[in-house]
Amino acid sequence: DTTESRGLGDVYKRQMYDAPGIGLAAIQVGVPKRIIVMDISKEEGKKEPRYFVNPVIKNKDSIKSTYEEGCLSVPNQFAEIDRPSKCEVEYLDYHGKKQLLKADGLLATCIQHEMDHLEGVLFIDYLSKLKKSMIIKKLSKLKSNTAVL
């Protein structure tokens, strides 16, 4: 339902901006829906949110690009990740209209990163076992050092 997806998208958009982050998948906030919001605009004060409902990647480039990625689900941890430099994604937009977007650069990376969440994959899953275990240890240590009052 477009109205429900739009309302949920607006909530996720606020959560993404509050975090702050450039993308958020519904599943990251415990909602098992295939909805993604993102905003990679760099201009201060100019927001350009994008909504992707039921996104499907139709094509990925064989050429890779590397970006340092972080994630609201893996706080304060960052790593360089190789992903296809371009992708085509089909989705329903904010108004429920079917769209096909050819993305490259940071937008392509962000789409793939957020779509990974829909499949239960985190950016740290692309790392070597050693790097991934180091990040998990850091997160566990942070969690155990955080007192709940």
Question: What is each PLM-predicted segment?
Answer:
Residues 2-3:
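Ala/Thr-enriched low-complexity intrinsically disordered regions
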Residues 6-112, 117-149:
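Active-site rim/adjacent substrate-binding subdomains
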